[in-house]
């Protein structure tokens, strides 16, 4: 149910032109502890993989878009295909599938009480939902293997030191920090620029340097034709806040 609710909320936020950034956080004392242990117990008694394929996939606006990489149409991994920035405010324990969800966010802000753990190895499972792809890109191969093998607990402060979190803040300032970052993006940055740069960064993970340069050159030509570029120059010269058009 959580995955369905998240997909519905992401869809609503993406389709609302007034929303420029999306914050995902947990209800209660934790961000997301992963799969329900009772469900895992039922799966193990039923012989394993039955029912796994029934997990909710990407929202329809992503799943039905032919221009989206199929890799970003799976459960959890669709966050990179969302055209708006997604900020994960990690407010407590985050494990397993919950960690995968956080890894696919664009920005992660952790509370000091946050605890990150992969948990997979202690459940007899493997790195699911793209964790083996995303985690090394954030913390490096050695740290990723350590976290995956040991399933040890990583604090919010260590997560920031590793690059797993962009910031570590006091618990009582977590949401204020996330909202301030989202508001900064909404007030100062062109939504189209964020959309295109997000596409560039995730595409570059599977491109050669030359392919990434070619894409950048094509997108720069298109950017110079936009009202965003005109406004970007105008507000700087006129020394006023920008008024960028919505995507």
Residue positions per predicted region:
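Conserved CoA-thioester-binding segment of acyl-CoA-metabolizing enzymes
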Residues: 1-27, 41-46
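A short acidic, glycine-rich active-site loop
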Residues: 45-70
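CoA-thioester-processing core
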Residues: 75-83, 89, 95-149, 162, ...
